Amino acid sequence: MRIECLYEDEMMFVLNKPSGLLVHRGWDNAETVLVDYARALTPGGTAHPIQRLDRGASGPVLFAKSAGMARELSEWAQAGYCRKDYLALVRGECPERLDVDHPIRRRLDGPRVEARTLVRCIAIAHTEPRHASLVCARPLTGRLHQIRRHMKHANHPLIGDGRYGRGDLNRPFRERYGLARLALHACSWRVERPDSHAVVGGLVPLPEDLCEPLRRMGFDLDEDRLPHDLQRYLDPWEWPSDASA
């Protein structure tokens, strides 16, 4: 498997994770994880993931090149200077704007903690058996499965989500449109460097396993495999004062 490196400097680098690959090894002791690819790129094999990304999701993951840089970048991320925006396909006709401010549990048996996600609807497709909406989501907090859980709470669960979605809807989208994965992709990333405050980042095109099903549903994507005028949905959200990693 070839993993694309989206950015690299002396402090950090960003890898483009495909759907189906874990960021790091967990209880299931996966044979290969993204950290393995990351360590192969660095002298001495040291790479520290600063962000997580669900196994079924795709898109950029930030790594630090040393333990010291990892501590610095983690603190910087918690202060709100690392941002990702996501494209998601959700059930039903989503409102033009959603502000989901709903506490969620860190663990099944733990207390609820603050969680907030901003959502903007890009387009609606008249798919069968239910209409579907392509949305842009920006999590202002970094809780586990936050976008997936918040969209379920809003009654617009993600298509292809085996945990928080509905199998009776996921199945037709797989059979009719070829969508065989979680419909969640981090399409934009931005990091303000803690040393110089220079901003690095960029857009990340949809992978083919998500791009082609969306086109079959009738969504209009440009030659860069992103929705037309995507930047229009990203710009108005510039760095909310209460944003965190």
Locate the predicted segments by residue.
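RNA pseudouridine synthases
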Residues: 1-129, 172, 203-245
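Pseudouridine synthase
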Residues: 30-34, 38, 67, 129-191, ...
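Glycine-rich GHKL/ HATPase_c ATP-binding element in histidine kinases
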Residues: 84, 133, 182, 198-200
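Short, structured patches in soluble enzyme cores that scaffold and shape functional sites
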Residues: 90-92, 121-123, 137-139, 160, ...
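Short acidic, glycine-rich loop/turn motifs
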Residues: 106-108, 141, 191-199
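Short, solvent-exposed loop/turn segments that connect beta-strands within catalytic domains
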Residues: 126-131, 194-198
